[in-house]
Amino acid sequence: MSTGKIIQVIGAVIDVEFSRDNTPKVYDALNVKEANLVLEVQQQIGDGVVRTIAMGSSDGLRRGMVVENTNAPISVPVGHGTLGRIMNVLGEPIDEAGPIQYTETRSIHQAPPAYDELALSTEILETGIKVVDLICPFAKGGKVGLFGGAGVGKTVTMMELINNIAKEHSGYSVFAGVGERTREGNDFYYEMKDSNVLDKVALVYGQMNEPPGNRLRVALSGLTIAEGFRDEKRDVLMFIDNIYRYTLAGTEVSALLGRMPSAVGYQPTLAAEMGALQERITSTKTGSITSVQAVYVPADDLTDPSPATTFSHLDATIVLSRQIAELGIYPAVDPLDSTSRQLDPLVVGHDHYETARAVQKVLQRYKELKDIIAILGMDELSDEDKRTVDRARKIQRFLSQPFHVAEVFTGNPGKFVSLKDTVASFKAIVNGEYDHLPEQAFYMVGSIQEAIEKAKTL
């Protein structure tokens, strides 16, 4: 095992000098035993000097400290021993529940599966959330992005998806907390524990307080564990909250590594880094990885390079809108902005497809009429347009739904609505079967039956 010494420390980026014959390879993990710190090699500068990123805090490091080369990349344990445990980026347990029992470790840097290994699936995963099942259904083995600005409900919507799918789904789940609030990680752990599904979930956390090197790699650590389960012929759910923080960590590190920034100050390697992660989240002939990723949208701008780069990798995009959240409609999903490749008559069936498009058509017409209503009022509209507006407002309210994970805040018990009920209900509203009910009856209910019951009390 070759050793070197630290020659420069600039925040999270540390230069280490080795002898010329023993220069470490890119991505090799280096150990600073004295500071109990792991470094990852990013660049070879020449003359035996390598530039590395610290996986922990670089406080207290000084020049001349001895560094050992492990001659291998960072590796994490895979397999059943990781279930029910909270790990850090290095795969070390941080839940104070003793060491992890494992028989195999894997490097966090893996090549994506070969083309002939890939498998496509069109089997729809039922989420029980009306707006998602109707407008942007997602397939087993698909990739879903939850886009939204600050405070519109990404994490709550994701927690509800985890609650509804992970509990119904008999397979394993991996949750990677990338640069998010430690409190949310804590809440999630106890929620899984209370629902008795903790023994089917592996948790990998690199939260907001961690240095950028850690946040840049923690998504890969979580993904490696998910790949381990997939290669055991299992169907895995992979949850990443938040993919934007992964990009942001890359931006923080990039400038320190001496790269020229590109658009909006992002790293020039943004697309390559995103591709390296996303191409590995895929289903093979042995098993599937279905991923749900929360994507923070800076300043609500979907054209920002980070969310824009993420878009191209996804099968379904669920866009959360601040305008809808302001109306008090939760989940604040924008049914006109959200899309899915699975919304195809050959996949979801003719009835579902026609209903979803009819709902979007009514909402789009309402959006166009809003300006006229604001200037001239409802009275100036034709009878047909008045009917459209009336139905659109009912649809808008019926797209709201009480969540299981939000019961403690709202006092409303959560509702799981089957796909069959969802399609039938919206079809009936669009066809005018419930024109006689007041629009308040449709707000924050599960099935249409509940709306009918609620109307009797109004």
Swiss-Prot record:
Locations listed in the record: Cell inner membrane
Catalytic reaction equation(s): ATP + H2O + 4 H(+)(in) = ADP + phosphate + 5 H(+)(out)
EC primary class: translocase
Top-level taxon in the UniProt lineage: Bacteria
Lineage, uppermost ranks: Bacteria, Pseudomonadati, Pseudomonadota, Gammaproteobacteria, Thiotrichales
Binding site residues for ATP: G148, G149, A150, G151, V152, G153, K154, T155
GO-annotated molecular function: ATP binding; ATP hydrolysis activity; proton-transporting ATP synthase activity, rotational mechanism
Family: Belongs to the ATPase alpha/beta chains family.
Functional note: Produces ATP from ADP in the presence of a proton gradient across the membrane. The catalytic sites are hosted primarily by the beta subunits.
Keywords noted in UniProt: ATP synthesis, ATP-binding, Cell inner membrane, Cell membrane, CF(1), Hydrogen ion transport, Ion transport, Membrane, Nucleotide-binding, Translocase, Transport
Gene source species: Francisella philomiragia subsp. philomiragia (strain ATCC 25017 / CCUG 19701 / FSC 153 / O#319-036)
Keyword rRNA processing: no
Protein name: ATP synthase subunit beta
Presence of the UniProt keyword Nucleotide-binding in the record: yes
Enzyme Commission no: 7.1.2.2
Secretion signal span: none
Entry's Gene Ontology cellular component terms: plasma membrane; proton-transporting ATP synthase complex
Membrane topology type: Peripheral membrane protein
Subunit composition and interactions: F-type ATPases have 2 components, CF(1) - the catalytic core - and CF(0) - the membrane proton channel. CF(1) has five subunits: alpha(3), beta(3), gamma(1), delta(1), epsilon(1). CF(0) has three main subunits: a(1), b(2) and c(9-12). The alpha and beta chains form an alternating ring which encloses part of the gamma chain. CF(1) is attached to CF(0) by a central stalk formed by the gamma and epsilon chains, while a peripheral stalk is formed by the delta and b chains.
